[in-house]
Swiss-Prot record:
The gene is sike1. It comes from Xenopus laevis. Interacts with IKBKE and TBK1 via its coiled coil region. Interaction with TBK1 is disrupted upon viral infection or TLR3 stimulation. Interacts with CDC42BPB. Associates with the STRIPAK core complex composed of PP2A catalytic and scaffolding subunits, the striatins (PP2A regulatory subunits), the striatin-associated proteins MOB4, STRIP1 and STRIP2, PDCD10 and members of the STE20 kinases, such as STK24 and STK26. Keywords: Coiled coil, Cytoplasm. The keyword Coiled coil applies. Belongs to the SIKE family. Residues 4-32, 154-192 form a coiled coil. This is Suppressor of IKBKE 1. GO terms for molecular function: protein-macromolecule adaptor activity.
């Protein structure tokens, strides 16, 4: 039982570390979107006389913005499902340990009642000593399981909060990327119109 409880504690720690990594990845995604937005805003301020290299960067950003949000969204959803499944498995394992402990306590109480009812002639002190030792061990196990239960409840709550925040951030990122693509489309259309107008003016000359 001790080895299994230690494993549950270790799994809970691993889960918390994964949630932290998950949050860091979301923060990185937000930073990337912010940089992308600033670059597009800077390009917009340049005007119709945008250098050729900025036009190439616009095309690259447009292509990247089409692929990155969808791929990252799929990855985040997969990670959330995995974490939720892992939480469920750990919680079921904890419930099994609690049930096993309750079963042990039930058998112990039954044996003690039988011992008292039968009045087996045995030295009093050894019986009391064994009773104290066994009770102490059970109390330690109960305390550890309570600690594990609290840790698991906190981990599950943290997982649910993180999942909600990540979904909200991803939705915001998708909206921002959609707006960026619209801006890029307008800028490209403006560049094409300006180019055609310049060619037309040149041909008239």
């Amino acid at each position: 039982m001790t080895c299994t409880i230690d494993k549950i504690l270790q799994d809970a720690k691993t889960l918390l570390e994964r949630l932290k990594d998950h949050d860091n990845a979301a923060e990185s995604l937000i930073d990337q979107s912010s940089v992308l937005h600033k670059r597009v805003k800077a390009m917009k301020e340049v005007g119709t006389a945008m250098p050729e290299k900025y036009q190439e960067e616009l095309a690259e950003i447009k292509d990247a913005s089409k692929l990155r949000p969808h791929v990252l969204l799929c990855q985040e959803n997969t990670q959330i499902r995995d974490l939720q499944l892992e939480n469920k498995e750990l919680w079921l394992s904890l419930e099994e340990h609690q049930y096993a402990l309750e079963l042990i306590m039930s058998k112990y109480r039954k044996q003690m009642l039988q011992l008292i009812a039968n009045k087996i002639p045995a030295p009093t002190e050894p019986v009391l000593e064994a009773h104290k030792t066994f009770s102490s061990d059970l109390e330690c196990q109960i305390d550890r399981i309570c600690v594990i239960g609290d840790a698991m409840r906190k981990a599950i709550q943290l997982d649910e909060d993180q999942a909600y925040n990540i979904q909200e951030r991803l939705a915001q990122l998708e909206l921002e990327n959609k707006e960026l693509r619209e801006i890029l489309s307008v800028r490209n259309e403006s560049l094409r119109s300006s180019k055609k107008e310049s060619e037309w003016n040149f041909s008239e000359k």
